[in-house]
């Protein structure tokens, strides 16, 4: 059985180049300014993934608690993470009010409407989406890191969630790590939560790479994907997921850059009757910041690397 898995995996890796899933330009202008296309699949193989963390506890509809675009360039070993603040006030296609919080798009129309809303407002073409709810997140973390993921826990966080740990560095398992990425009752509020989400995402990437860093361990990759699919929803087929994970192993990640949208000083806090408290963003300024971030060679700013 192991030999069969190795043969299948070798065929998968040999048959999928780094550009197999990038058929279109990845950054599409939403303003009159033209961006020079430097993202052809035969040159860089750029892939854009929409990562969604939903607040679902089993309900048929839920809001997106985390919205992250991960742009991956395997041959260059670069990952760029863009966190879109869920309270950003944007135009949602088909919404009776026109504008609402970004996470309302997911509540109304799931992954597809959220992808369209992001494309219409920010000009980012998403290749694939992956969503995971609270229970799925906890189970997935326990699957890839049975001993937990080490993070720095504050006293405020411990008090807020009644966590059974001491302040400082702790290896948190699934359910406790979920509290870490959801916490927002300090001076940083949602902005701190976004930073922690990006931090944990990078550490998950490291766990995956360590788990499958040897050829022998790759034999377990198909079974791992089967188990992982029990905890996430994705528009990707199993073979596509295997190909992406294999690239993470065979193309070492050299740089991870991160950006938060809206960028600093590009929004104001507003309140609307139909949506409550929102971040009313300067859309043009954020589009330009986003384009600049994606088109610059990595590392864009080492200060933001984890």
Give the ranges of each region predicted by the language model.
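Sec-dependent N-terminal signal peptides of Gram-positive bacterial secreted proteins and lipoproteins
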Residues: 1-20
């Amino acid at each position: 059985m192991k030999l069969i898995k190795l043969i299948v995996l070798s065929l998968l890796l040999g048959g999928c180049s780094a550009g197999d899933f990038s058929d279109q330009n990845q950054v599409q202008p939403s303003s009159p300014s033209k961006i020079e296309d430097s993202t052809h699949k035969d040159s860089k193989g750029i892939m854009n993934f929409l990562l969604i963390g939903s607040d679902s506890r089993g309900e048929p509809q839920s809001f997106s608690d985390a919205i992250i675009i991960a742009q991956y360039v395997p041959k260059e070993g670069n990952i760029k993470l863009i966190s879109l603040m869920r309270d950003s006030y944007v135009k949602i296609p088909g919404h009776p009010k026109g504008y609402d919080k970004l996470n309302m798009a997911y509540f109304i129309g799931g992954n597809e409407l959220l992808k369209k809303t992001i494309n219409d407002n920010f000009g980012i073409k998403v290749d694939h989406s992956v969503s995971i709810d609270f229970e799925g997140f906890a189970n997935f973390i326990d699957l890839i890191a049975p001993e937990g993921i080490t993070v720095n826990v504050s006293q405020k966080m411990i008090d807020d969630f009644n966590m059974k740990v001491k302040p400082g560095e702790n290896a948190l398992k699934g359910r406790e790590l979920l509290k870490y990425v959801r916490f927002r009752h300090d001076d940083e509020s949602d902005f701190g939560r976004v930073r922690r989400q990006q931090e944990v995402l990078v550490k998950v990437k490291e766990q995956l790479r360590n788990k499958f860093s040897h050829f022998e361990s790759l034999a377990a990759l198909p079974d791992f994907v089967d188990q992982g699919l029990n905890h996430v929803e994705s528009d990707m087929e199993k073979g596509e997921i295997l190909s992406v994970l294999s690239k993470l192993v065979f193309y070492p990640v050299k740089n991870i850059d991160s950006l938060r949208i809206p960028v600093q000083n590009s929004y104001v806090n507003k309140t609307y009757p139909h949506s409550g408290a929102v971040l009313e963003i300067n859309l043009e300024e954020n589009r330009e910041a986003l384009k600049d971030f994606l088109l610059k060679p990595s590392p864009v700013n080492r200060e933001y690397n984890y």
